[in-house]
Amino acid sequence: EFGLKPVKLIYDKQPSRFEIPTIAIFENNQLVGKITLMAVHGTETFINEIAEDFTGDEIYSSLRFATDLMRSRKSVEIGVGVITSIHIKKGKRILERVLQVLPRILTEYTNSEIDTIIIGKIAAVDLDVNFTEKEYNHIENLLNQDKTKFYSDKAKEILLKIGYRENNNGILYSISQM
């Protein structure tokens, strides 16, 4: 079973021409990495290419499971995809493995105290390890506004649907388990 300790989720509602959601990972208010999510098309080739970016049957199985899940629910638009690319700054690998679908964010972190996650369309579609200066400044601006929530109604709706709960401060907590 995996659980996620309380993590502050900030929603970026800034309009963007990019359709790829990105999670920015912060440790003590410092960017330590980002996770880029791509839509799942369900093809064997697509999944095989993704699996080659990682090692181990476990990750491969997780990606296959997530793809099957998305495929089986294609009549209901979930609006999220599978974690397919992991970009870590400074070469620090903080994700031990990848588990299924974005909103659960049920990933094991190794030796990291993650305190803030920004969910939103904040990143360009590329394979660069580092954020562009524009991306970084945009995220910094969001943090500096010192608000607990920047709602993307769709994102919030999805998170609540799969087991997150909101407290009085507008912070969503995961109560999901696997």
Which ranges hold each PLM region?
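Non-catalytic substrate-recognition and accessory regions of acyl/acetyltransferase enzymes
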Residues: 1-90, 104, 108-178
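Conserved glycine-rich acetyl-CoA-binding loop
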Residues: 88-100
